[in-house]
Amino acid sequence: TELVIGISPPFANPLKVAVAEAKQQGINVKLVEFSDWNTPNITLNHGDIDANYFQHQPFLDNAIKETQFKLKALDKGVTTHVGLYSKKYDSIDAIPENARTVIPNDPVNQGRALLLLQQAKLISLKDPNNHLSNLQDIVSNPKKLQFIEVEGPQTARAVDDADLVFSYPHYLRLAKTIDPNDALILDDNTNTLYSILFVVRDDYQQQHPEKAAQLEKFIKIYQTSDKVKQTLNSEIGEKLWFPGWK
């Protein structure tokens, strides 16, 4: 048997280390990379892969609401911080009026971006704690930031053109557009709401008990291996992630 896990490219290298360690324990895992954030759930729901690893709980909740897919989180992986980045300005204070500001277009990550812009005191939101706020919920925008909405993975490329960009360290590292450590501000989140999840179909453990047991072993390797941890530090950045499984 072979476990097939659908993943986002920025998560590939630490997972590959876990795959090599799992093989030594007789567990065969194949990683399939998806460049967008819709196909991994469609493919999982269809039964073409055993699990996916690319999304956090709010994103999964929203996907289930929109598609009625029968999916659930099996376990948590890494939690990454997010940041505001700029190649043109070296502080939040230096951001000018009408700055072209790039944020993700999906409701969940847009909400996360707006919370960070609020933390940076660039905007304020109707409900300051709502992690699903959208552009209509901005009650003050003193610098008249101009918002440009792009797909989440594309935020890393936008750093070259825009004035200010919300993005993810692991995507920036992959795109090589800017050093992920050079954020003007990072989110101060310490909870695991945004941990990346290992997601399976609702009935996976009942339908495939042997494979599910192997998958759980693989996840344990990912969570506990020193080599995986070293790779996460080099791939994401030591201060830019923390474990979601504690």
Predicted regions span which residues?
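Ligand-binding clefts/hinges and TM-proximal coupling segments of bilobed small-molecule sensing domains
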Residues: 107-133, 219-246
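Short helix-initiation/N-cap motifs at beta->coil->alpha
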Residues: 31-42, 129-157
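Ligand-binding "clamshell"
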Residues: 62-74, 87-90, 161, 166, ...
